[in-house]
Amino acid sequence: MAEPLKEEDGEDGSGEPPGRVKAEPVHTAASVVAKNLALLKARSFDVTFDVGDEYEIIETIGNGAYGVVSSARRRLTGQQVAIKKIPNAFDVVTNAKRTLRELKILKHFKHDNIIAIKDILRPTVPYGEFRSVYVVLDLMESDLHQIIHSSQPLTLEHVRYFLYQLLRGLKYMHSAQVIHRDLKPSNLLVNENCELKIGDFGMARGLCTSPAEHQYFMTEYVATRWYRAPELMLSLHEYTQAIDLWSVGCIFGEMLARRQLFPGKNYVHQLQLIMMVLGTPSPAVIQAVGAERVRAYIQSLPPRQPVPWETVYPGADRQALSLLGRMLRFEPSARISAAAALRHPFLAKYHDPDDEPDCAPPFDFAFDREALTRERIKEAIVAEIEDFHARREGIRQQIRFQPSLQPVASEPVCPDVEMPSPWAPSGDCAMESPPPALPPCSGPAPDTVDLTLQPAPPASELAPPKREGAISDNTKAALKAALLKSLRSRLRDGPSAPLEAPEPRKPVTAQERQREREEKRRRRQERAKEREKRRQERERKERGAGTLGGPSTDPLAGLVLSDNDRSLLERWTRMARPPVPAPAPAPAPTPKPSSAQPTSPPNGPVSQSTAPLQPAGSIPGPASQPVCPPPGPVPQPAGPVPAPLQTAPSTSLLASQSLVPPSGLPGSGAPEVLPYFPSGPPPPDPGLTPQPSTSESPDVNLVTQQLSKSQVEDPLPPVFSGTPKGSGAGYGVGFDLEEFLNQSFDMGVADGPQDGQADSASLSASLLADWLEGHGMNPADIESLQREIQMDSPMLLSDLPDLQEP
């Protein structure tokens, strides 16, 4: 055999010395790697869609490790959908089980903020050749990752609305005892109407009710590292819905700053970033760490104090940071739940308990705990497909009109149709004036007896006497005949009109459902405001009758305001009046001691108990001069401003309503309040000409109407003019396989994520990237640590039978 080898070398003409033959295995290994890479790409990037004549494929949205998703159009209705193809779905047990799990969960869920299955294509090939699964889903133009990391405007209202929809869907999911485990922006699908749907349930699990289920929970765990909860990284063995709330907090922070909150390069770096913000975990958390080396590593670090969220996100909304702080806690039990987060003041604008449903019954994960073979999983998936179509056909039969009137056109209507007409002379005469009773005798058979000659029954067998005014038998017969005649005429004129099947109902889009919910919420708020308005009117009438003895002169009458806004407006009205100096330090001329009611000049002190009785604009000029200074310029008070005139609380309200420019926010003195008027001039000097007092009342009413209007309106955030194209990750196709395979086979993983690749390699759904990025560590140690914290990779290349060992 040595001869042919030498001849082969001679034919090659390389002329290399025999010592260079050692490089041949390297060349062979590289060829095997290239072959395996080409094979994996061919198996995963199979974009040939065999969907029959019902759907028309438009374009490919994205592809990944688990499948390919394309947009399509249904030929019958023109509706656009997304079709996800899972090629070779039964080759790997892990991927087959993932497909079965996702089908079962999505069939169980029916929620506006969760991706829904519209159809599952039946296999068109024999059972033995069935390999690819086609699932028809809602079509969403983009995902939240593309929105955040693009030039698309993202306001605080967008963030609030996205977060509300995410928590609304999460509340429904958690009520079914389902934990998503892989929430990230690319798994949240978004359309141009700012509607959000949660997708990719392939890694979902149920709640762990016993320690024996912890291993099941961590099986095939693939949470993206940047959104991974601490209990999963530290192996705290406390796996609850709080895992998803941590991911929601990371997504929330990413929306606020449009950058990732904890972009760790590897496992250790991820822990460091979390502790830099949240500080060192409590001793209880450290003692609960399941991995000994991880516990020793955390204890070796110097203690750190938590950083205030105002420092992490300077200038962000305080209520938003309050909610963010309640989501991101080391202790899972200390995190806020989805239901409680919906009640947070930051989401009060959209919160509606009647429109935030729960899921019943809970989802059953019993099938997922069984050790299933590929053949059993295939049988289960085929059974799920048939069950989906059986349910849909059953629903169609329930809503379809039954053809109960169809036989009427060809068959006799009923025996009553042959009754004689009510206008027949013989029948009516016999019934109204029956002949005298005849003696019983043998006559013809009962079926041949003439009704007109039959004797009347005895009096004892007659029906009870009819009440006066009741409908007679003749009238009943006439009505019956008229109805039957009308029915026959309708059948004769248009026999197919009542039998036509109703035209198919136009499918209701998600946007129409959202409009219905907003209209329902608006009507509910209007009814609540009307009730509050009537209650306030009753209170004003009672207060006016008890104090003034006449009709109320409240300028806020008829307007709907909350108690807080009303109190602030009343304080503002008092501040709009000329300030009253304190009696003690007033340098005004001394009043006459002999007067029972001393008068004072315009700048003199006024009793504080008399000031709030009437607004400044309603006091007559001559009569009110001894009590209140004249309207117009506001004099500078000689003493300190009384406590009720402090303007700090009202400043925040007025600024938040955008009624005044920011430049009108100086100190808290009473003369500084005048710039807050929407149309008023700057505060005049005491020596200038007085302004008429009637100009103050319209300003207060205008502000009141604006505040009242803001209590009723519930505007949605502006729609997106153009959404960036999504990657398809939210449909559960997995991470970008081409880039991942190139990096994995070349062993050329960079130290960190490259620019423009924020959601690909570093956001892959496998811990294999963590192992490859662990520079400076022995691979055996990394694998040992991975086993210790019970986190396995779902993508085992050895499961593929076609791959060759290099």
From Swiss-Prot:
Domain of life: Eukaryota
PTM comment: Dually phosphorylated on Thr-219 and Tyr-221, which activates the enzyme.
Residues where Phosphothreonine is found: T723
Residues spanned by motif TXY: 219-221
GO CC list: cytoplasm; cytosol; nucleus; PML body
Chain sites annotated for binding ATP: I61, G62, N63, G64, A65, Y66, G67, V68, V69, K84
Catalytic activity: L-seryl-[protein] + ATP = O-phospho-L-seryl-[protein] + ADP + H(+); L-threonyl-[protein] + ATP = O-phospho-L-threonyl-[protein] + ADP + H(+)
Required for binding to MAP2K5 as annotated region, ranges: 78-139
Protein's name according to its UniProt entry: Mitogen-activated protein kinase 7
Source lineage: Eukaryota, Metazoa, Chordata, Craniata, Vertebrata
